[in-house]
Amino acid sequence: MRVLGIDTSLRSTGVGVVDSLAGKTVAVEYGRIHNTDRVCLSECLRRIDGGIREIILRTKPDLASIEDIFFAKNAHTSMVLGEARGVVIAACATSGIPVYQYEPRRVKQSITGSGAAEKAQVRKMIMVLLGLKEEPQEDAGDALAIALCHLNSRSPVPELNPKPI
């Protein structure tokens, strides 16, 4: 199974593609879709859409996983993140890729055993679990963690498996 993990952000959307075959899990590719603060909102969203579609075409994932919505203190920040998240979901849906979502605490717990783990702890565990030689950038590491969370959430009992959004 190939999973595309996406850590949605307007300025630095992390992406990570992970393969799980015959009990072995490997990182296929990871990185980020970067937008500087000089790029307007609509152009940022266009770049995120194009970047996600390009990764889907190149890596052919079976599905995508993203983090569930969290509440920011600033309403404007929440709205912008929601717009970026909508673009990501639409790009996946248009490409025929089902999308699954996980709460941030569940992602951390799935990787480290603790839902209160620090981001640095998550990235270190990602390195161990995927055999990476270098620590991925924060957004890319988060995306790999989100992909691994989906793989760790599968059950042999179909009724217990997560449902796409």
Identify the function of each model-found stretch.
Residues 1-165:
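Phosphate- and other anionic-substrate recognition elements at nucleic-acid/protein interfaces
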